[in-house]
Amino acid sequence: MADEQLNEKDLNAEEAGAVDNGARVQELEEQLAAAKDQSLRAVADLQNVRRRAEQDVEKAHKFALEKFAGDLLPVIDSLELALAHSSAEDEQVKKIREGVELTLKMFQDTLKRYNLEAIDPHGQPFNAEHHQAMAMQESAEVEPNSVLNVFQKGYLLNGRLLRPAMVVVSKAPSAPQPSIDEKA
């Protein structure tokens, strides 16, 4: 009988030890899963930081010329104005005009190499993202909300707006006001 009680105690102790070992194994497995999850998150965070840094460097390279290009735009505007206000037939101005044309072409070619493109929207529909309306003018010849005149060209640098085009936008002609005689 004493042996049976000892055997029962040993069995109970072994069962309790097995239960303790099973709980310990489960606890360790949970800790392992948490550690794996934490390491995966750390790797993902590192990849995100690396990707963001690469994107920031790419943007810095892409738009590093933004201020410099913006400072050159008035020079281009001045050259274009000089050509617009000079006569190609005037012999005294002809050589100077040719020089200004060549200088302007060199400027434009250089800017194209750096992905700076002009926006000259004459006759196109008004686009508030790329155009700045300076005035509205009635016109029966073109669709309403079309660009009638361009005061100043706009420019895009790598597809991003550097300067909006300043434009005159058409509007539908208003109906003539009836005269006093017609109202009566």
From Swiss-Prot:
One GO biological process this protein is involved in is: protein folding
Q: Which Gene3D superfamilies match?
A: 3.90.20.20, Head domain of nucleotide exchange factor GrpE (2.30.22.10)
The source's superkingdom equals Bacteria
Q: Which keywords has UniProt assigned to this entry?
A: Chaperone, Cytoplasm, Stress response
- Feature: compositional bias, Basic and acidic residues: 1-12
SUPFAM superfamilies named among the record's database cross-references = Coiled-coil domain of nucleotide exchange factor GrpE (SSF58014), Head domain of nucleotide exchange factor GrpE (SSF51064)
Which InterPro entries does the protein's record reference?
GrpE, GrpE_coiled_coil, GrpE_head
UniProt GO MF annotations: adenyl-nucleotide exchange factor activity; protein homodimerization activity; protein-folding chaperone binding; unfolded protein binding
Record-linked Pfam families:
GrpE
> Can you name a GO cellular component term?
cytosol
Cellular location(s): Cytoplasm
Q: Which family does it belong to?
A: Belongs to the GrpE family.
What's the stated role of this polypeptide?
Answer: Participates actively in the response to hyperosmotic and heat shock by preventing the aggregation of stress-denatured proteins, in association with DnaK and GrpE. It is the nucleotide exchange factor for DnaK and may function as a thermosensor. Unfolded proteins bind initially to DnaJ; upon interaction with the DnaJ-bound protein, DnaK hydrolyzes its bound ATP, resulting in the formation of a stable complex. GrpE releases ADP from DnaK; ATP binding to DnaK triggers the release of the substrate protein, thus completing the reaction cycle.
The protein's assembly and partners: Homodimer.
Q: What is this protein called?
A: Protein GrpE
| Species the sequence originates in | Pseudomonas putida (strain W619)
Origin organism lineage: Bacteria, Pseudomonadati, Pseudomonadota, Gammaproteobacteria, Pseudomonadales
> Gene for this protein?
grpE
